[in-house]
């Protein structure tokens, strides 16, 4: 008899889990496919814009941004229930994802909603540097992004631009005042990182910038 009770309880639990998973699966799929109509329907039924994909740990907004689902992303960002600073398992926020995917519209919308531009560790500016988007990097700097923000391994946005071969962003950051003399946890400068990644031309640009700086004199 006790076995039958346990089986019945397990069956009820599985049915409950399946029922909960249905709408979650649907909203994740809507985010992936940019199904604006389905998203509106699900949100109208009370499903949260902060729903997390149980498979990836990403929010549906992050999924929409990653997949280029502009309509769904815009609707989620406009939802006043949206929690702007939700993080994926790797620490990414929606603003970071938007910067990496070069989604200028989403970056502007998220900042207008109050998204944090500079966080401890990895920042949206690192991601804009990695993707090579000078427009988004400029927007972030205009909204007071810390230009020398350091990742957990002490990589600055300039170092990321150098490593990824993004010369335009590297030059933008240098013009904006990035400190080219900083070193990461391997004791490498941005120039050395560029050379190691076989981007000697970017390394040369950084070296020329350093050479033109005023010499620091001890008091």
Feature names for model-found ranges:
Residues 35-43, 69-78, 103-112, 133-142, ...:
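Ankyrin repeat structural motif
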Residues 2-10:
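Sec-dependent signal peptide recognition
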Residues 20-47, 55-58, 74, 78, ...:
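Intrinsically disordered, low-complexity regulatory segments in ankyrin-centric signaling systems
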Residues 52-53, 87, 117-120, 150, ...:
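Ankyrin-repeat boundary/linker signal
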Residues 20-29, 143, 176, 185-188, ...:
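Ankyrin-repeat-protein effector appendages
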Residues 49, 83-84, 114-117, 147, ...:
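Ankyrin-repeat inter-repeat connecting loop/turn
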Residues 29-34, 62-69, 97-103, 127-133, ...:
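Ankyrin repeat A-helix N-terminal signature
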Residues 23, 56-57, 91, 121, ...:
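Start-of-repeat signature of ankyrin repeats
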């Amino acid at each position: 008899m006790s076995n039958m009770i346990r089986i019945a309880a397990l069956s009820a639990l599985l049915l409950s889990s399946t029922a909960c998973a249905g709408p979650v699966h649907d909203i994740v799929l809507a985010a992936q496919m940019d199904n604006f109509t389905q998203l509106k329907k699900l949100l109208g039924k009370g499903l949260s814009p902060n729903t997390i994909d149980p498979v990836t740990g990403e929010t549906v907004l992050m999924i929409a941004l990653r997949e280029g689902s502009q309509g769904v992303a815009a609707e989620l960002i406009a939802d006043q229930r949206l929690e702007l600073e939700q993080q994926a398992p790797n620490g990414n926020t929606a603003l970071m994802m938007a910067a990496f995917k070069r989604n200028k519209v989403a970056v502007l919308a998220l900042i207008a909603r109050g998204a944090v531009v500079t966080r401890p560790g990895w920042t949206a500016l690192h991601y804009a540097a990695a993707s090579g988007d000078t427009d988004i990097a400029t927007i972030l700097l205009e909204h007071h992004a810390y230009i020398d923000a350091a990742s957990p391994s002490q990589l600055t946005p300039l170092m990321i631009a150098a490593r990824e071969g993004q010369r335009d962003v590297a030059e933008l950051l240098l013009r904006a005042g990035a400190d080219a003399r900083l070193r990461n946890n391997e004791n490498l400068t941005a120039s050395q990182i560029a050379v190691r990644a076989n981007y000697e031309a970017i390394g040369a640009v950084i070296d020329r910038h350093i050479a033109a700086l005023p010499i620091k004199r001890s008091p």
